[in-house]
């Protein structure tokens, strides 16, 4: 039993509660705070197994107070099904190997564009995001927290910003995608500990709840969230995509793609410290290649990997946060590490 409790990652003694307080579970269910040994659904799990990472994450999120084993005792051990099953996310057709070029039509169908409406009424696409379910887009908090604009719409299924309809080929060999889906916003939730200062950007993550579910098709699909232990080794490549700045102009018309290597975090911390910036373990450093990086228009977009070759599943590992001048050699860009924010994500999505 005690081994199972240690696995939960909460190092404190069990305490008794004289009053049964009302509480809300991570799934939004109204329940009662009970000592864990009095909550049958949790206690049976602890004494028989205690080794499921998802349930352990849910249990930690169910604590009524930090520092004790009093839990919000609801009817389930797992987060709600607002997020897709891992068999239904991160899927796309098989496309050619990357090289820092235009994507193919339909490639990376989880890519989102955020429309920013300024106080003057002017509208533009200034940030990106990632569809993670039929109702939620994951992005950077700095993309949605602003006094000069409001994020008013999300576009999904886009490829070429110049075209009224995206098509490739010609004649009888031409095929086209459906029109992009422009969806309004029901609510935006930025991380409560988001901070942007002269020392850096911290907890740079936000969730956008769409006004309606997306219509899934070949061109609009959610990407998988990472596993809690998902870490790409230093030197291996991850991917970025978006409509960000290129060498010749401020923004690309077509969705771009690029491979970037993960760089050593301690070395990245030292490098940025010389410029009075703080890098912490909830961040990923990647890139630093001359002329190749994620740029301003890609803010909030994904840094993502794949589980294998061919028709692999893709998962989001980071969110584009900030960096030095785009494409500066030796200066990797900074990404929010998604696996360190899984509990927060799961607590803030609902069906």
Swiss-Prot record:
Primary enzyme class: hydrolase
Keyword annotations from UniProtKB, A to Z: Calcium, Disulfide bond, Glycoprotein, Hydrolase, Immunity, Innate immunity, Metal-binding, Protease, Secreted, Serine protease, Signal, Zymogen
GO biological process, one term: innate immune response
Chief location bin: secreted
Activity regulation, short description: Cleavage of PPAF2 is Ca(2+)-independent. Inhibited by heparin.
Limits of the Peptidase S1 domain: 97-350
Maturation and modification: Proteolytically cleaved.
GO CC entries: extracellular region
One Pfam family it belongs to: CLIP
SUPFAM superfamilies listed in its UniProt record: Trypsin-like serine proteases
Gene3D superfamilies tied to this protein: 3.30.1640.30, Trypsin-like serine proteases
Domain Clip intervals: 22-73
EC number: 3.4.21.-
Subcellular location: Secreted
Record-annotated active site: 142, 204, 299
Subunit (UniProt): In the active form, heterodimer of a light chain and a heavy chain; disulfide-linked.
Protein name: Phenoloxidase-activating factor 3
Protein species of origin: Holotrichia diomphalia
Lineage: Eukaryota, Metazoa, Ecdysozoa, Arthropoda, Hexapoda
Gene that encodes it: PPAF3
């Amino acid at each position: 039993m005690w081994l199972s409790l240690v696995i939960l990652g909460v190092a404190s003694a069990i305490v008794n509660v004289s009053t049964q307080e009302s509480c809300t579970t991570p799934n939004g269910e109204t329940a009662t705070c009970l000592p864990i040994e009095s909550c049958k659904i949790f206690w049976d799990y602890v004494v028989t197994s205690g080794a499921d990472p998802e349930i352990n994450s849910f249990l930690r999120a169910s604590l009524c107070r930090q520092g004790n084993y009093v839990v919000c005792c609801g009817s389930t051990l797992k987060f709600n099904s607002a997020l897709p099953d891992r068999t239904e996310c991160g899927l796309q057709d098989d496309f050619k190997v990357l090289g820092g070029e235009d994507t193919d039509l339909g490639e990376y169908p989880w890519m989102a564009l955020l429309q920013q409406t300024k106080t003057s009424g002017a509208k533009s696409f200034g940030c990106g995001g990632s569809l993670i379910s039929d109702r939620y887009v994951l992005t950077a908090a700095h993309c949605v927290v602003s006094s000069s604009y409001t994020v008013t719409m999300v576009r999904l299924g886009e490829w070429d910003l110049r075209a009224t309809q995206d098509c490739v080929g010609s004649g009888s060999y031409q095929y086209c995608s459906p029109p992009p889906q422009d969806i309004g916003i029901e609510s935006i939730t930025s991380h409560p500990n988001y901070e942007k200062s002269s020392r850096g950007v911290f907890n740079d993550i936000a969730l956008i709840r769409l006004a309606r579910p997306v219509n899934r098709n070949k061109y609009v699909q959610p990407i998988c969230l990472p596993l809690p232990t998902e870490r790409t080794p230093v030197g291996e490549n991850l991917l970025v995509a978006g409509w960000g700045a290129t060498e010749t102009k401020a923004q690309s018309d077509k969705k771009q793609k690029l491979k970037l290597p993960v760089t050593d975090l301690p070395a990245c911390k030292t490098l940025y410290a010389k410029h009075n910036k703080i890098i912490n373990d909830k961040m990923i450093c990647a890139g630093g290649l001359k002329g190749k990086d994620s740029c301003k228009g890609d803010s909030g977009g994904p840094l993502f990997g794949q589980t294998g070759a061919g028709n692999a599943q893709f998962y989001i590992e980071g969110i584009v946060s900030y960096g030095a001048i785009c494409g500066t050699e030796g200066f990797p860009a900074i990404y929010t590490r998604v696996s360190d924010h899984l509990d927060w994500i799961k607590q803030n999505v609902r069906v």
